[in-house]
Amino acid sequence: MKKQFLSFTLLLALSTWIAQAATVRGTVSDTAGKPLQGVVVTDGYNFTQTNERGEYSLDSNLDKSRFVYLSVPGNYEIEQTKGIPDLFYQQLDKSKEINEHDFTLTPRKQPIDGFVYLAISDPQTIDERQMKRFREETIPDLKQTIERYQGKEVYGMALGDITWDRMDLFTPYKEAVSVLGIPMFSVIGNHCLLYTSPSPRDRT
């Protein structure tokens, strides 16, 4: 009897520890409130999937992880604002012991069987003159390419070094790609960092 009680106590303590270790948690559901199972969620270091109740939890190191985000399943929309994908990530607050973040996904009206991936390598604009060229030369060229794939979903991605150490050029860049009519993702490059920041965490 004593062994059974001890085993139960250890199991209870372990369950409590696991719950406390989950520094980031939340739910993923659709716009009708239906829980979504099997959605991949990550903090950039750890990965998990939602359970049958749409719940996820991550034991995140908040000194390293700045965001929690998910991989949007193919039968749900990629939400965007003026061409910049959003709503698939949320910022973490390292001052809180527990971060709770819920996600809501919009089901597609029609299923798709594929998409076109448009990659742009290193725009690396260093001043307003180069940004003007990006806007007046690169953007029209991209629009022509996109028009060739009418009827298909097109997703763009800038593969880092969007500017050349010029943080003030990100806003003109976002304005430029907003006219493409497609979700435009961006990857950070070594020239997309604010090196004057004393904290490595705040350089991105």
Region locations from a protein language model:
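Bacterial N-terminal signal peptides that target proteins for export
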Residues: 1-6
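Bacterial N-terminal signal peptides
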Residues: 8-16
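Short, ordered, surface-exposed loop/turn motifs in non-cytosolic proteins
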Residues: 22-24, 30-45
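A short, amphipathic beta-strand motif
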Residues: 24-30, 54, 103, 196
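A short, solvent-exposed loop/turn motif at the edges and junctions
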Residues: 43, 63-91
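Short, acidic Ser/Thr/Gly-rich low-complexity loop/linker segments typical of extracellular
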Residues: 45-59
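N-terminal active-site segment of His-dependent metallophosphoesterases
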Residues: 79-171
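Single conserved hydrophobic/aromatic residue that forms the stacking wall/gate
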Residues: 195-204
